[in-house]
Amino acid sequence: MTTNSLVLSGTITRSRRFKSPAGIAHSVIMLEHKSQRYEADMLRNVYVQIQVILSGPRFESVADNLKAGVEVQVQGFMTLQQGRNGQNRLVIHAENVELKT
């Protein structure tokens, strides 16, 4: 099975922008999601913070709006990224982003 697709909405808590050595523009945001979902007929609180990476020219038009406090919905795929400390973490690479506020 090769499906890897995710849609997640939430509030941006941090953001930064940079260009790679190849000149590709990147925006990196920390997305905070809070909701309630039913699981096994019980209501549970759901909370997650996850890094989202937006790469390339298609995101340049919204990059200025990706600031702390802004609500967004992100569609993309998940992958592991190795941090400077050598530990892997799950991140989302965005394929689409929609501003909600």
Curated annotation (Swiss-Prot):
Subunit structure: Homodimer. Interacts with PriA and DnaT. Component of the replication restart primosome. Primosome assembly occurs via a 'hand-off' mechanism. PriA binds to replication forks, subsequently PriB then DnaT bind; DnaT then displaces ssDNA to generate the helicase loading substrate.
Function, as annotated: Involved in the restart of stalled replication forks, which reloads the replicative helicase on sites other than the origin of replication; the PriA-PriB pathway is the major replication restart pathway. During primosome assembly it facilitates complex formation between PriA and DnaT on DNA; stabilizes PriA on DNA. Stimulates the DNA unwinding activity of PriA helicase.
Gene Ontology process terms (BP): DNA replication, synthesis of primer
Identification of the protein by name: Replication restart protein PriB
Keywords: DNA replication, DNA-binding, Primosome
Residues in coiled coil: none
InterPro entries hit by this protein: NA-bd_OB-fold (IPR012340), Primosome_PriB/ssb (IPR000424), Prisomal_replication_PriB (IPR023646)
Disulphide linkage map: none
Record domain SSB: where: 1-101
UniProt cross-references to HAMAP family, sorted A to Z: PriB
One CC-aspect GO term: primosome complex
Domain of life of the source: Bacteria
A GO term, aspect molecular function: single-stranded DNA binding
Record-stated family: Belongs to the PriB family.
